[in-house]
Amino acid sequence: MSKNGNQDISEFDPLNREFTEAEKQQQMQQEQEFFSQTILDIADDGFMVASSSQATPSISFLSNNRPHGDHKSDPITEAIRKEILEKQRDILREYFVNTNPELAEQIAKEEDDRKFRAFLSNQDNYALINKAFEDTKTKKNLEKAEIVGYKNVLSTYSVANGYQGGFQPVQWENQVSASDLRSTVVKNDEGEELCTLNETTVKTKDLIVAKQDGTQVQINSYREINFPIKLDKANGSMHLSMVALKADGTKPAKDKAVYFTAHYEEGPNGKPQLKEISSPQPLKFVGTGDDAVAYIEHGGEIYTLAVTRGKYKEMMKEVALNHGQSVALSQTIAEDLTHVQGPSHETHKPIIIPNQELESSIEQHTSQQVPPITTFNKSLQPKISQIHQLQPQQAQSSGIPNPVLNAANALSTSMQDLLNNINSYLTKNQDINKQSDLIKEAAIAILNNKKSDFAEKQYNIIDLAKNIFSNKDIIADAKVNVVNTLLETIQNDQNTLDIKKSKILEDTVAITLNSENIELKQKQQILEKVVDIGLSIKDDISRVVAVDSIMDTVIKSNIANEDKEKIFITVFDQINSYEFSNVAKQKLLDSILKKTAETQVLSPEQQQLMNQNLDNITTEHTKRDTIEKVNNILLEPLSNTALKTTNIQVMTSNVLDSPVQIEMKSKLIQVVTKTVAESALVEPKDKTEIVKGIGKTIVTHSDTSLPLHDKVVIMGSVAKGIVESKNDLLDRELIIAGLVDGIYEAKGDNAVVHAISSMIANSNINQSEKEALKRSQDVVSEKVLDKEIQNLDRELKAQNINESKLHDDIYNKTQDVANALKNVITTVLDDNSGQRGVSEEAPKKVSSLLNDISKRTIEKINNLRAMLSQDGNLKTFEEKKDEATKKVDELVKAFDNKSSTEEQQNFIKSNLIDNKTLSREIRLQIIDNLLKAQAQKRAETIENLSAKTEDVRVISGKSELKPISQDEPYIQKAKMVVERDRVDIKDNIKIMSALINARDSIQSENFNKSIHIKKESSFPQR
């Protein structure tokens, strides 16, 4: 007995069993023999009793007679223990040494490995062991040990290798159907029948499982073997080894083959007894029913085993009865990574299971005639028997027959029994309402089970949903109603948290979309109901989680991409029309659009359209938020007009600095202005001051973040907000005048003022109001005229036309003449030579100097006349503006003529960055035009991907083409027309980057000087 009072069965446990010295010596001898044998080839038919050149590995058996009473394990069992299990223990030991050095004493290598076997048997260590099996390197080494070990065992102990009674090919004695059923009789070495084996091949398209990395794999074919439980025909022992098949039903390569082996050893009466089961790890099942087939993930691939959940449980119980032990190293996970077949559970090991508990479970099974909840199937079988009973009045109202109610109330049977009873009722009753009532009652019973945890409820609800889809007695349209009833029951359940409901909704979507029993139309109807329930969740976080999980399931489903697109569009519209805040809609839609962009579920056109819709929603939300903020500022009783103006200006500046598009900025500033203009909280004169402040803020905002073009657009929107507001006409005139005053006080550009005039003329107000607003337009015109006069004056000063300077030049020249004349007279008077008289020399000098004065005066006058003439260099503001525009167009055209990206980059540097002869404003305008052109080309390419340009390339070389000329026959060339995208996106990005860098460089030139120019120059600002 063990210390805990349970029977010690370690001698039957291949991992923990202690061996005698004689057994150890025998094992060492066998191990030496293993590696001296050759490994046999594997044939192609996929089914064998032993590995040989004439048959394939699938089922292998060894049978021989052993003396009664010899309870020592036979060589096959011992070989598997040593070749596979001991080596796998060493691999696990190495993992723990590296990851958990504190376990060194517990896992130390010993002759009998007692400590480590005890460590593996301790349930407290299962979490650590599970991590080991999840480690990629460790898992790979465990798989390799299993593959190599089986090769050694199957080749060493084969009939072909001279081992008497060893593994050998199955000889088919009866083949009912080559594709469905095969059978053979297994005999011992004396020719006595031990059992009959049947193999059934199952074709399917409904089984989809997920690998550890989340990749989904469809199982198209698997097989089942009727492994015998009791053998009472002949004496001997037997080993059945079944190779795991690939997901398509074919056998794997011999270097990847693993096996499910049942070991039958001779019992006390000489008859074979099922003592051990060796299986790959981790073992999983596709579904929760007894007919669910086993599968494994090995080497990154999915393989099926020829055993079902029901058969596996039955065999494990027999092992326990015979004091044997499962040697599966299978570690289990809570559920499969797919919800297509429903949650898939696996048996949580223990490696050692106390016999007392096993025997108790078996007695219970015998008395109740239903599978009990034992350590083998506890995690597989929901506790249906504990579901809350329906009240009598519920039974009467639903019209559900007593057998079904008994199944849902007492539930002494399994979930499958409940489903069977439901199906029986559905077959007899085709009324949709009654079918829906039945499903509702069953769902309530499952959800109201207070002793069942959420996982069990979830599994049972999903089983119920799967049953609805697979039931042929419910027509397709009726399935929609029945499933929707089930969903409503889940929605109305008060005992389940919203976050948990979302898990059931997610599973329901997976089952719905992957069902082959309903059309896309019905799938969409059910999905709309699921989304509606998800959107009805009150908590924002839970709602987002629910909708996100639903859409993730849609993306992972096996429906076509065009169908996924239809579903996403429907869900988008559903969310958009739902009655909750724009903030909530924004979060949901933004999350969905990120998913569609990442997975490319939507076409580019549809993605763009949805993004625009989201932008509109965002705009509306921002507008409402902006109105609220403006009203809060205006409502503040302790703030005077100056403080309110300052606060509105700060708010305006924040909008202008925001990263949104210019269209959004215009709309928001218009909302601010219109809210101020229509506010009943502020007097008209105060509104005028506030709007005047808005105008100043726009005009003086940094040209870097807000170019002139953008200021013009925004000012037009501001004017529209005022002109089309609900104010009295006189108030609108006053506010418009204030806006214009603010622009001129801030020395705004004429283009900004013209934007206001244009908006007034083109507004949607009636003609009488337009005429009444002429006064405001006149004010604007006068302001513009004053501005033009100021600009002309600045231009004259810039051309050095200054009256005082001209006067000084003539006066100074005259003074020079007088001084020269004085010098001449003095010279003449001092001349003693007497050769020339004063009367002769003085007139000549005076005449010459006066002539110089006349020429100088005439030159100055002519220059002034030339400057003031129509052909002169003095130009008006509009003339200079036109000249600048022509220069901009000329250089833009020159840029477009550059054929390569490199030439265009050089053009940007030489003509825009380094060319200081061009004004700063002209260069910046050129860059703006080029940036817009590049963006337009890129947008057109994205919108019409099929549009191509033709490029002619020349190829040469050996070909059957004719030579170019008779003189050069060895040169062969051909023109090849190559279609290419109109815009190379990578080159487009390079050019736009170069333009942006150039703009930054130009804007940083003489920053202080540029500020002065903005105040004094009339050239169009940016």
Curated annotation (Swiss-Prot):
Q: What is its main location?
A: cytoplasm
| Highest rank taxon of the organism | Bacteria
- Which GO terms of type biological process are on file? symbiont-mediated perturbation of host cytoskeleton
Q: Show the segment(s) annotated as Disordered.
A: 1-33
- Which compartment or compartments is the protein found in? Cytoplasm
Q: Where is the composition biased (Basic and acidic residues)?
A: 14-24
Q: Does the keyword Cytoplasm apply?
A: yes
- Establish whether keyword Cytoplasm is in the entry: yes
Where are the annotated coiled coils located? Answer: none
Keywords of the record, alphabetical order, are:
Cytoplasm
Q: Which residues form the signal peptide?
A: none
Q: Which NCBIfam families match?
A: Sca4_fam
Name of the protein in its database record: Antigenic heat-stable 120 kDa protein
Native organism is Rickettsia prowazekii (strain Madrid E)
